[in-house]
Amino acid sequence: MQRINREESFRAKEERLKDLFVRGLSGNNAAYQTFLGELSSYLRAFLRKRLIRLPDEVEDLVQEALLAVHNQRHTYDPSQPLSAWVQAIARYKLVDLFRRRAIYEQRNDTLDDGMDLFSSADAEAAEARRDLNKLLADLPDHFRLPIMHTKLEGLSVREAADVSGMSESAIKVGVHRGLKALAAKIRGAL
């Protein structure tokens, strides 16, 4: 019995909204304003059920759906139930919201997810620095200093010569022979 009352109540609301909407389409501004007010309550309830975990999005989505109903009012077929047409529009707006959120979340991963990437990159860089320092420590100064100044510190050959007190050609030869010695040492370690 209670179910019958609910169905009758729903049908009565459906007919009332439909009547207001059709009168509004005919130019009755007061009926259209009343329709939009009552429809917003209907949409709010409809969307609140579907956005339990996103309650902050309900009002924005109600406004988007109302705007879509207004913009698409010319597509409504009066021989069809108004609620089905409105719910279809609201569902499309709901899907749009979920797509926007998915794209946003995909583009904006939380920092916690990326912290492992940064920490492993830092750890790998520290290991590489340590290994390189061990390799360079075994080289004589006339090989080690030119490599450190030009390859690690980014100095030009002239700047490296000024800093180390060596000639520019000695810097070039030192870098070449030092890298060759490092390559041989690494090959021997493998």
Swiss-Prot record:
Segments of the chain annotated as binding DNA: 157-176
Region (Sigma-70 factor domain-4) residue spans: 130-182
Region (Sigma-70 factor domain-2): 34-102
Principal location: cytoplasm
GO cellular component terms, A-Z: cytoplasm
Highest taxon listed in the record's lineage: Bacteria
Alphabetical list of InterPro entries matching this protein: RNA_pol_sigma-70-like, RNA_pol_sigma-70_dom, RNA_pol_sigma70_r2, RNA_pol_sigma70_r4_t2, RNA_pol_sigma_r2, RNA_pol_sigma_r3/r4-like, WH-like_DNA-bd_sf
Keyword Cytoplasm on entry: yes
Compartment(s) of residence: Cytoplasm
A molecular function GO annotation: sigma factor activity
Presence of keyword Transcription: yes
Function: Sigma factors are initiation factors that promote the attachment of RNA polymerase to specific initiation sites and are then released. Extracytoplasmic function (ECF) sigma factors are held in an inactive form by a cognate anti-sigma factor (NrsF in this case) until they are released. Regulates expression of only a few genes (Dsui_0154 to Dsui_0159) in response to (hypo)chlorite, conferring resistance to reactive chlorine species (RCS) during oxic growth.
Family: Belongs to the sigma-70 factor family. ECF subfamily.
Protein name (database record): ECF RNA polymerase sigma factor SigF
Organism: Azospira oryzae (strain ATCC BAA-33 / DSM 13638 / PS) (Dechlorosoma suillum)
